[in-house]
């Protein structure tokens, strides 16, 4: 019998969600995927975690919980860093115009919190988390 190959769960970095929203995100993701979800709150801890870990996906809230600043600023910093620029990033927002703006900055098309549990959202995440 061939040795069993251990499959490592994918890592997701969730940025800028308050405690209750982070909990909802973790439940949604772990229900649908074998993944570990870490939390960051702003640019400094986000970049530090990304440089120290291997993340399959970064989910950035459109408005950060710590100071209500624009999450697209973190997206810009990730995409400007040669070591991180290929890391897939999605903006979490229910507003199509903000999804469009994030895509123009190099993000993958994200989803909003109202879309948790939607089969289309799960399908969108599969290419990063399966």
Model-derived features: where do they sit?
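Conserved acidic segment of CheY-like receiver
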Residues: 9-20, 25-29, 58
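Short acidic, S/G/P-rich loop/turn micro-motifs used as interaction or catalytic elements
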Residues: 18-22, 63-68, 96, 116
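Acidic, metal-coordinating helix/loop segments flanking the phosphotransfer/catalytic sites
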Residues: 41-57, 63-65
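Conserved phosphotransfer cores of two-component systems
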Residues: 51-53, 79-85, 105
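Conserved phosphotransfer microenvironments
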Residues: 59-78
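Alpha4 helix (beta4-alpha4-beta5 surface) of REC/receiver domains from two-component response regulators
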Residues: 70, 94-111, 115
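A short, hydrophobic beta-strand element within the central beta-sheet of small alpha/beta folds
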Residues: 85-96
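C-terminal output helix
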Residues: 115-125
